[in-house]
């Protein structure tokens, strides 16, 4: 089956860079070595305030211990001078993946990613009016989502094995379609719905073996669900340094799809007899009928 790649994944960093990189270094010493760290959700401070904690790393005075790849959510990512809007390195071992797409990391993992947040007022507008210049818009467009879908299916390898990891800031609408009492909906009583129909599209269309998302400050692993090639495991991750001590990190060991034949890639379903249908396309479970008195 090939060698597994050990990675760390964190939820929203929210500008808590010192805590993030200290945690990564500590975990790498205790349980590593890890070959990558992936960050989903809001990476920079939510209100666009100072990101001074990042400066020592950008200036080379402090080092990022593990190659770190991040996306952004709906925060203002522009306070950091020189943020490459289409992705690139901020400093050694710290890489912004970009707005939307699919790429292979040096460790062999194939990741699909979508930065930004869903805004129904902007979603169907043309990129002509929102792209260009040096500023990064905090929302994504329908064509960005389609770009991720297309990139995840381009090439013989992707057609056979899909991608290893889907990274989004948000959770998708209908993620809870098939949940029951054994896995309660952690967002059921939230006063504001922050779920994204665009992420629903990605969850249903991208054959990823893992889907990582932040934003909700919830740590949860949902039962694996069937995609068109194998099975997807969804992880919601808490924010780094959150006051309620929600777990913000998960460690994974992943065999890159490049090392898997089609039959091995499909073993994801065979190895998980409890894999559910895709929640994004499935019909809701019927509600229990109360017993008559």
Q: What label would you give each PLM region?
A:
Residues 1-293:
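Extended recognition/assembly regions associated with phosphoester-bond processing machinery
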């Amino acid at each position: 089956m090939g060698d597994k790649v050990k990675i760390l994944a964190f939820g929203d960093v929210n500008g808590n860079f010192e805590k993030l990189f200290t945690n990564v270094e500590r975990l790498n010493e205790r349980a590593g070595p890890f070959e990558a760290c992936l960050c989903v959700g809001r990476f920079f401070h939510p209100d666009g305030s100072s990101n001074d904690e990042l400066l020592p790393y950008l200036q080379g005075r402090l080092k990022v211990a593990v190659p770190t790849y991040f996306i952004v959510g709906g925060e203002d990512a522009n306070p950091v001078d020189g943020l490459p809007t289409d992705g690139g390195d901020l400093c050694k071992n710290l890489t912004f993946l970009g707005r939307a797409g699919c790429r292979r990391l040096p460790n062999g993992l194939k990741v699909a990613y979508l930065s930004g947040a869903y805004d129904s007022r902007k979603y169907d507008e043309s990129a002509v009016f929102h792209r260009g210049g040096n500023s990064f818009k905090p929302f994504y467009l329908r064509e960005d989502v389609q770009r991720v879908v297309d990139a995840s299916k381009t090439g013989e390898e992707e057609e056979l094995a899909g991608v290893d990891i889907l990274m989004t800031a948000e959770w998708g609408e209908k993620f809870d379609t098939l949940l029951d009492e054994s896995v309660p909906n952690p967002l059921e009583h939230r006063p504001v719905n922050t779920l994204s129909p665009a992420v629903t599209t990605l969850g249903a269309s991208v054959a990823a073996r893992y889907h990582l998302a932040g934003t909700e400050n919830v740590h949860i692993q949902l039962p694996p669900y069937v995609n068109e090639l194998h099975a997807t495991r969804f992880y919601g991750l808490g924010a780094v340094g959150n006051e309620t001590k929600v777990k913000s990190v998960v460690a994974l060991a992943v065999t890159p799809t490049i090392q898997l034949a089609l039959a091995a890639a499909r073993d994801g379903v065979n190895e998980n007899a409890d894999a559910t249908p895709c929640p994004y396309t499935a019909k809701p479970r019927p509600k229990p009928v109360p017993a008559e008195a």
